Amino acid sequence: MPGRADPSGGRAAVPVPLPVAVAAAPSPASVRSALPERSARPGGAGLRAKGFAITDLLGLEAELQPPPGAAPGPAGGYEGGGALGLGLGLLCGLAGPGAPCLLPAPLPLLPARGPRPGPPGPPPAARRHKESASDEDSLSGDASELKMPASQIKRKKRRHRTVFTAHQLEELEKAFNEAHYPDVYAREMLAVKTELPEDRIQVWFQNRRAKWRKREKCWGRSSVMAEYGLYGAMVRHSIPLPESIINSAKSGLVGSCAPWLLGMHKKSMEVSRKAESQEKPADGWQAEQDGEELQGKQASSQRSSEKLGPAKDPEDTAIDLSRTAKQEKRSVLRQCVNGDPTTEQKDRDH
């Protein structure tokens, strides 16, 4: 490529792509001739024709134009690289002729100066939303941490358990051996004996039956469990014991089809009989009191009748006498009118 003669009379060397040592540095006049051309461009718009100056030949002023429609990048980039190359050229020119200088390859291959552009970040609105969401998460986390102790306290609050004494357990076990399903009357009697509420006694029996069933299942007595379930249903729904089971127990409980059920039925019947026998003395004493009251009423009525008797008798007799006298008068008149011989004979006798 032919070079242009500069004022100093030297020729410029052809540029190579790799850094090379330049034997003769350009004079300051050539560098100054390039500067007005660079500053004459209005705002850097449009491309001018390349000259034959050392800066043009070495590509020191080569600037990459951004593609149309592309957003302008951050300040720096290749324009900064061009300015850097220009500064290097000036330094080489001032160093004087004959001083070797290493110049870089075409500057478009140089990396951009300044901070490397990272991946495109989210827009400011999205960033604000993200920050607000993180704040809300942190607030909710703090609130949940504050709420956790309350929930743990609520979970720790358990129902008050009834602590049974030895005497209460003894009475309850006795009642359980007599009947696994006590009725309301039996539970009330137990409540009086043990000084426990009736509902707590009912819950104790439920737990005791569950424990008994678990133990029987471990022993593998399935027939007893079936009888137990039947007995519970009978007690709940007031169903009488089937006659077939009662008839099968005539020879004894051992030969019956449901010995355990019959045993429990027998125990419950004994308990009910005991309760009836305890109620009978009270009923007899009340009957005696009622009889005594009736006798007293009868005696008082007799006394009142005796007091009124003498006053009534003369009146009754007077009424009767008046009636008989009237009847006699009527009969005498009739006899006189009729001329009855009997009346005449009576008059003669008189």
UniProtKB/Swiss-Prot annotation:
- What positions carry the motif Octapeptide motif? 52-59
A biological-process GO annotation: regulation of DNA-templated transcription
What name has this protein been given in UniProt? Answer: Visual system homeobox 1
Family recorded in the similarity comment: Belongs to the paired homeobox family.
Protein's cellular compartments: Nucleus
- What gene is this protein a product of? VSX1
Q: Which residues bind DNA?
A: 157-216
- Tissue expression: Restricted to bipolar cells of the retina and spinal cord.
Statement: the UniProt record of this protein carries the keyword Signal = no
In this chain, the stretch annotated as Disordered covers 27-47, 112-159, 271-350
Principal localisation: nucleus
Origin species, per record, is Gallus gallus
Q: Name one GO molecular function term.
A: transcription cis-regulatory region binding
**Residue ranges, compositional bias (Basic and acidic residues):** 271-282, 304-315
Biased region (Pro residues) positions are 112-125
What does this protein do, in the record's words?
Binds to the 37-bp core of the locus control region (LCR) of the red/green visual pigment gene cluster. May regulate the activity of the LCR and the cone opsin genes at earlier stages of development. Dispensable in early retinal development.
